Amino acid sequence: MTNVPTDDGPWLVVGLGNPGPGYAGNRHNAGFMVVDLLAERAGSRLKSHRSRADVAEVRLAGTRAILARPLSFMNLSGGPVSAVRTFYKIDPARVIVVHDELDIPFGSVRLKRGGGDNGHNGLRSISSALGTRDYLRVRVGIGRPPGRMDPADYVLRDFAAAERRELPLLLEHSADSVEMLITDGLEPTQNRYHALL
């Protein structure tokens, strides 16, 4: 069983981050970066939408998808995500949220459906707004902060120089995993990407 929803409605792929140029290179904006890459691959650009999100209607792996970046700050992502989902009449089972994950080493990608928010306020806001935790997550590993650095400060800093050299590959793997998730379902995608370092 592949866990791919059987209806032919669109997918909603949400990248989490904070809006504005001052946050663009932050670790917390990994989700935005992946959605931007997906839009670029599809030959599209995200544009302002009445749902308080930047949105693009694209085809990913031959399937209709809505890409979205909430224009609220991370902690308030749920409102725009819920508004986009309602506008396009997308089932929560077809929602994929791409976000940074502290507890996964930098360079790794992990996928799951449902579960807790692990202290991620963007996920907490989305779960509350959707009324369910049962949506797909693509978790982009950013690693733990060094020493005693506050994780809240760490996620709001830009990727380090050494990380920036590896970042394009991480974003490519993350975007690839979104497309495979849509075509093949959760378990095959987990089997492929969880085996990578």
Curated annotation (Swiss-Prot):
PROSITE patterns in alphabetical order: PEPT_TRNA_HYDROL_1 (PS01195), PEPT_TRNA_HYDROL_2 (PS01196)
Q: Which UniProt keywords apply?
A: Cytoplasm, Hydrolase, RNA-binding, tRNA-binding
Protein's cellular compartments: Cytoplasm
Key word Hydrolase present in the record?
Answer: yes
Q: Which GO terms describe its molecular function?
A: peptidyl-tRNA hydrolase activity; tRNA binding
Q: Which InterPro entries match?
A: Pept_tRNA_hydro (IPR001328), Pept_tRNA_hydro_CS (IPR018171), Pept_tRNA_hydro_sf (IPR036416)
Purpose: Hydrolyzes ribosome-free peptidyl-tRNAs (with 1 or more amino acids incorporated), which drop off the ribosome during protein synthesis, or as a result of ribosome stalling.
| HAMAP family xref list | Pept_tRNA_hydro_bact (MF_00083)
Protein name, per record: Peptidyl-tRNA hydrolase
Q: Look up and give the organism this protein is from.
A: Frankia alni (strain DSM 45986 / CECT 9034 / ACN14a)
What lineage, starting at the top, does this entry show?
A: Bacteria, Bacillati, Actinomycetota, Actinomycetes, Frankiales
